[in-house]
Amino acid sequence: MTETTSKTAPWTVEKRTAILVLADGTVIEGKGLGAIGAIEAEVVFNTALTGYEEILTDPSYAGQIVTFTFPHIGNVGTNAEDVEDLTPANRHGAVGAIFKADITSPSNFRATEDLDAWLKNRGVIALAGIDTRALTSLIRERGAQNAVIAHDPSGKFDLEALKARAAAWSGLENLDLAKDVTVGQSLTWKETPWTLADGYGEQDTPEYHVVALDFGVKRNILRLLTGLGAKVTVLPATATAEDVLAHNPDGVFLSNGPGDPAATGAYAVPTIKKLVETDLPVFGICLGHQMLALALGGRTEKMHQGHHGANHPVKDYTTGKVEIVSMNHGFAVDSDSLPENVEETHVSLFDGTNCGLRVVGKPVFSVQHHPEASPGPQDSHYLFRRFINLIREKKGETPLPEREQAA
């Protein structure tokens, strides 16, 4: 790849209305879409072929610009049902998006709005018409990039000022974003998973009570819990262990979320440590997995480029099976730092990084990937049943089959 620290990159379009300025001075020009403005963020790439709306509304992408490696994004439009952030009015999720091709008119029976208008309404700045393969290769070689994405229909940009902003931004390390995306107060979640015939349902006869600590939770996680018979009480990220226990839960869920897990060390990690000391079943996903590892005495580290996509192979040591899963994280647990009473349960077959753990002798476990998918494969849905079975075991009930039986 040609070095382009002082001039416009070679994969750009002639008439620019948006630009991406990397911290090293590289400038990528294209067509602007979505919101007008400029913002600093980390540039990553996602390899999923579908589910762009779920990806862009995943709160785990707060502080990031998503480069879609699949060239055609926006074909099926958008709708209110596929939004993943818990409070859409707050527009938590990715702040920028990068596409290979221009957005076309949507064609789908569920579409209510085209992607460009939807991006505008959510305040997401987008750039189209660039060589996303070249940008993805750059990220793979140099790592996730700090950058500024800017959109102005006039095409007029102060490049030197934008370069200075990109170079000055400190990035996601030591940045606590969980407090920014969490709910403001507790709420009860009843919505169950979507079906083609009925859409979303509602859980009116719950058998269990799960408290979910919201560090940036996705809706589909909560739906899968309610779909298995749970009443879910969602608490803010800053809730204490005493706050959680006051709800008398049967189990505790630690959600996904954005930012550096170590930056939550002043509030979330101590809370999780106290919860682990109880006999309550605890299940964590993504950021929740990382914070659980910290609470157990482990360490986390910033990854070179992170894992973002719906086609990642993971091995489950507890079953010996390989699953294809969805991932979205830029930090990872250092498996060598885990204490002796913590067992590694899952590992990435791409790079060998830790993807799961459990505490020996306690009903506590977590995974780095996203078993709820949305978007992605459903290979790991069984983990929600594994969590519910820990609750059922404490109640003296017969466990559910971890995998649904064929009809």
From Swiss-Prot:
GO function term, MF aspect, one: carbamoyl-phosphate synthase (glutamine-hydrolyzing) activity
Residues of the active site: 286, 370, 372
Superkingdom of origin organism: Bacteria
Binding site for L-glutamine: 60, 257, 259, 287, 290, 328, 330-331
Pfam families (alphabetical): CPSase_sm_chain, GATase
UniProt-listed InterPro entries: Anth_synth/Amidotransfase, CarbamoylP_synth_ssu, CarbamoylP_synth_ssu_N, CarbP_synth_ssu_N_sf, Class_I_gatase-like, CPSase_GATase1, GATASE
Annotated Glutamine amidotransferase type-1 domain residues: 209-397
CPSase: annotated span: 1-205
EC number: 6.3.5.5
Keywords: Amino-acid biosynthesis, Arginine biosynthesis, ATP-binding, Glutamine amidotransferase, Ligase, Nucleotide-binding, Pyrimidine biosynthesis
Subunit structure: Composed of two chains; the small (or glutamine) chain promotes the hydrolysis of glutamine to ammonia, which is used by the large (or ammonia) chain to synthesize carbamoyl phosphate. Tetramer of heterodimers (alpha,beta)4.
HAMAP family for this protein: CPSase_S_chain
Protein family membership: Belongs to the CarA family.
Stated name of the protein: Carbamoyl phosphate synthase small chain
Lineage, broadest ranks: Bacteria, Pseudomonadati, Pseudomonadota, Alphaproteobacteria, Hyphomicrobiales
